[in-house]
């Protein structure tokens, strides 16, 4: 039996990640609409719980964790990643869902493909490849269709939904760029343990989620922990 190449494994991980992210968005929409959960509450508690799980997992990498904790410069880098990368990314995603729906938020997020393609071409000082041009065109078509429902002269999405969707796309680029060096150096588990806790605690101090706790039943808690375990811990862990 042939072993999977790194490229093939990457394709499968990307596809599986997309499916899990989509299901996480649907679960988030379920909590936001049915239980009237706040995007602030959902993001803060989600990140804090996921950070605790990552912290437990990182105990197997005590050397890396100990080195990071003892070096303020490394910690500051991960703190910035946790707040301006992870927290902004997840908060804008749930706000985008709350003002539209999970499908719309995901389609708007594809604009990050356009932004990343432009940044890569500028960084390497080259023209875009054919596949990159095709990706940009498809992303634009998808956003135009979801925003207008095919009626080009009309904007179906509310301004808030569009703004949060665009902010979500920008945050995806920021999150990706901020994560490259620390994850490569320390591993995704250690970096996300500190980053998730940083973003979750920071947002919790600002918003105080314990004061706006939604009344969740069994289905609500299953959806929430599904988001934490599958849509966060599994999704943010590199194989």
Where are each of the predicted segments found?
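Glycine-/small-residue-enriched transmembrane alpha-helix faces in small-molecule transporters
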Residues: 1-44, 83, 154-181, 202
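Loop-to-transmembrane-helix transition segments
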Residues: 9-17, 65-92, 136, 159-169, ...
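Membrane-interface helix termini and inter-helical loops of multi-pass transporters
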Residues: 29-35, 66, 147-158, 207-221
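Transmembrane alpha-helices of multi-pass small-molecule transport proteins
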Residues: 35-88, 115-119, 138, 171-178, ...
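A helix-boundary/kink motif common to multi-pass secondary transporters
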Residues: 36-38, 101, 187-188
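Specific alpha-helical transmembrane segments that line the substrate/conduction pathway
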Residues: 41-52, 90-130, 168
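Loop-to-transmembrane alpha-helix entry segments
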Residues: 106-109, 122-145, 155-162, 214-221
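Conserved small/polar residues in nucleotide/adenosyl-binding loops
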Residues: 236-239
């Amino acid at each position: 039996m042939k072993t999977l190449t790194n490229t093939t494994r990457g394709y499968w991980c990307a596809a599986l990640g997309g499916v899990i992210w989509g299901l996480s968005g649907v679960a988030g929409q379920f909590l936001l609409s049915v239980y009237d959960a706040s995007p602030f509450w959902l993001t803060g508690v989600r990140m804090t719980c996921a950070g605790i799980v990552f912290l437990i997992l990182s105990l197997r990498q005590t050397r890396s964790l100990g080195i990071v904790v003892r070096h303020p410069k490394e910690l500051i880098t991960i703190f910035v990643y946790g707040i301006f990368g992870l927290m902004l990314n997840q908060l804008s995603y749930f706000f985008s869902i709350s003002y539209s729906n999970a499908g719309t938020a995901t389609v708007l997020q594809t604009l990050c493909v356009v932004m990343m393609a432009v940044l890569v071409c500028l960084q390497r000082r080259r023209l875009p490849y054919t596949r990159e041009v095709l990706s940009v065109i498809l992303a634009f078509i998808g956003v135009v269709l979801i925003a207008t429902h095919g009626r080009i002269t009309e904007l179906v999405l509310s301004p808030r939904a569009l703004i949060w969707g665009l902010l979500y796309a920008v945050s995806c680029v920021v999150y990706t760029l901020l994560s490259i060096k620390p994850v490569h150096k320390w591993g995704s588990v250690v970096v996300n343990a500190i980053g998730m806790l940083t973003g979750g605690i920071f947002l919790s101090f600002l918003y105080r989620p314990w004061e706006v706790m939604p009344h969740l039943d069994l289905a609500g808690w299953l959806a929430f922990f599904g988001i934490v375990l599958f849509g966060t811990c599994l999704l943010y862990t590199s194989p």
